[in-house]
Amino acid sequence: MSDIALTVSILALVAVVGLFIGNVKFRGVGLGIGGVLFGGIIVGHFVSQAGMTLSSDMLHVIQEFGLILFVYTIGIQVGPGFFASLRVSGLRLNLFAVLIVIIGGLVTAILHKLFDIPLPVVLGIFSGAVTNTPALGAGQQILRDLGTPMAMVDQMGMSYAMAYPFGICGILFTMWMLRVIFRVNVETEAQQHESTRTNGGALIRTINIRVENPNLHNLAIKDVPILNGDKVICSRLKREETLKVPSPETVIQLGDLLHLVGQPADLHNAQLVIGQEVDTSLSTKGTDLRVERVVVTNENVLGKRIRDLHFKERYDVVISRLNRAGVELVASSDISLQFGDILNLVGRPSAIDAVANVLGNVQQKLQQVQMLPVFIGIGLGVLLGSIPVFVPGFPAALKLGLAGGPLIMALILGRIGSIGKLYWFMPPSANLALRELGIVLFLSVVGLKSGGDFIHTLVDGEGLSWIGYGALITAVPLITVGILARMLAKMNYLTMCGMLAGSMTDPPALAFANNLHPTSGAAALSYATVYPLVMFLRIITPQLLAVLFWSIG
């Protein structure tokens, strides 16, 4: 058997063994995709014992390409929500998550200086302790750029594997410990979160209001201050028994009922100006109007603003809200449409059908992947990651590398959505498949390279010490920030658990947090809020630590 055939066969075996290990769960908690790393270590040990020779060049290419696939698909997935998560609504959560990253970096630096841990080893421990595989890839690349021998670079994968298991278990232990310390009642926390979300959250709500302000009588909607912007949309108007779709020129009268869509604070302001909320239904049932959700799949409308499509003027149809990547938005007239946007349309059936034809509304297209944008994005990401940034006093130029470059480019492209007929939307199933393939390839190679000396290091070497160092890097930041978030910020426990899981980019921890109260979405929401920024910081941090430690000796 040729070296290439043998290498592919061994990688397939690693994937099978590793995925089997990852699927084994104890009380609902397992290693997940991290099991591939340990599958690689097991197979790598026996490959070394048998004296087999694998193609080192092929392993290197597969490792790097797997990492690129993984970080690129992550960026495409979270790109639409990344910049939104940095705004005020998620600012507090992101600040606490950033604090966890900073404290973790400080603990790593202290351990490195106190115990004189070799640079590749301490970076591997850091990456494993925070269960972040792209950090491992970024750290290995910067070490190679600094001229570190390959044997030392491979030690990073071994120390990563030592610290990884407690990285998984440590966050679960922290959640449990914080629950005991603060005597948390999970049911109460879930109710409080739901109450806060309903009353003051930044979610999109609807309300029916009667026009009671005499100053608004015979005034066009476009002349009513609260309705002439993009914060509140009036999607239906009922006068006596007639329900209609209003336009900006529609004149309102005292006693009219308006169906408004917007965020709670803006709807409250509308009540103050227009009149009181009423229980009267403005449902389209029994009328010649209907409400329908339509998906944007026509390349010809991508990038166009809602106002430029003139749906109200041409078809008498109003867009009441927009769902983008799972986030509900007010359909501002300045919003540019992206592939996969889901629009709530209100109008007559024939008019809605006409608008649907303009927008596309071809569900089958959502299951198709445009491969050209995928490779354009990956190519641009690799180029971005290869740009050197020279910092005075540093021994090597800083680069985003093959982990950071594709991630940043994917975040940007995911946010842009489309350029002409090229769109960077990727169906969730396709995104997940490519992401899982990438991480399996990467971890398989890392495990294979670490397997030869793993048992010796664990039994006769410093493996146990590395596990202890990793436990500190995992636990100290989580416990510190958890206590601060609960005591000072009075953060909801379920929200805090999601934030802690997101700060470690740890899906098993999110699954554990979700199971604390399966019907509450608090943990998942906070996890998604901090995940994009933290993933970026986790990739950059080992590079900064490597250059810092290298420069100060």
Curated annotation (Swiss-Prot):
InterPro entries the record matches: AAE_transporter (IPR050144), RCK_C (IPR006037), RCK_C_sf (IPR036721), Transpt_YidE_put (IPR023018), YidE_YbjL (IPR006512)
Subcellular compartments: Cell membrane
Superkingdom: Bacteria
Keywords of this entry: Cell membrane, Membrane, Repeat, Transmembrane, Transmembrane helix, Transport
GO BP: potassium ion transport
Keyword Cell membrane attributed: yes
Keyword Ligase applies: no
One term of GO molecular function: monoatomic cation transmembrane transporter activity
Domain RCK C-terminal: 191-276, 279-361
Stretches that traverse the bilayer: 4-24, 28-48, 65-85, 95-115, 158-178, 371-391, 393-413, 439-459, 464-484, 493-513, 533-553
Its membrane topology: Multi-pass membrane protein
Record PANTHER family: K(+)_H(+) ANTIPORTER SUBUNIT KHTT, TRANSPORT PROTEIN YIDE-RELATED
Family stated for the protein in its record: Belongs to the AAE transporter (TC 2.A.81) family. YidE subfamily.
Protein name: Putative transport protein YidE
Gene of this entry: yidE
